[in-house]
Amino acid sequence: MLEADNIRADKKRETANTHHINARKKDSASPTAFDKEVFTPDSAHQSNSNKENPACHFNVPKNVTLQRNEKGLALVKDGMELRADFLSLLPRTDHNKIHRELLVRAAKIKGEQNPIAIDATAGFGEDSFLLAAAGFTVYLFERDPIIAALLQDALDRATQTPELAAIANHMTLIEANSITELAALSSGSSSVLTETMRNDFPDKETLRPDVIYLDPMFPERTKSAAVKKKFQLIHILENPCENEEELLSTALNVRPRKVVIKRPVKGPFLANAKPSYSLKGKAVRYDCFVFA
């Protein structure tokens, strides 16, 4: 099914690239949040092109650099590199495994052959990649411009990797505040999201996603030093969700068929809202709100 949709997906990604630029202009980070503008690419990859040099659009924090090498764009601090990449997820996308993923089970819409999902808190897009591998068309929102640049770089690399391309072509990144965009969707107002969805699904009378996925960052409890450092580096750019009530209420107002929320397995409900049901794993729990 994924291969059969490649032509539509290619057209969608061309449109998404334009929308990604527009969203960045509209929702760019405040320059007061950073000390100075820095970009340190390998000399072999230096370019005057904004497409090749995405960091020219924004500032990076003090003592942190963006570097591009043969592996792609990375955030670097004190010898620690942080790079978005989907290749390690490939074994989990096997047809016999993907539908056993707890996230996919939580997001599944019975009887829907071409479901649409919105990942309102994309981060590095790993969960969206799993949803896309399961057959979802996924719109990813990331509000931080640096994380968005790292994610877009990973998507661009994935579309050039044969074993990842069919999945990545079902993922569209929009750099914008998801609360603003979801509010526009629920009210019928024009926005980057609504324009993108209309272009992708011109025959749909009602623009409504089947699933909205929320993954507000929560404290990482793993004993792995490498993973702890990774989250420390992410938190330099973006803090855990501070407006969880607004995020959840805005998602619920869209009235998708499901809202799925990722939480620590023993953590409280997001905004203290009780879901329709939950699916529990060893470390995480998916709280599901179901609508008719």
Language-model segments: residues:
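Conserved proline-anchored active-site loop of SAM-dependent methyltransferases
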Residues: 117-130, 209-228
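SAM cofactor-binding core of SAM-dependent methyltransferases
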Residues: 100-107, 115-118, 122-160, 176
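S-adenosyl-L-methionine
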Residues: 1-12, 20, 24-25, 33-42, 144, 148-204, ...
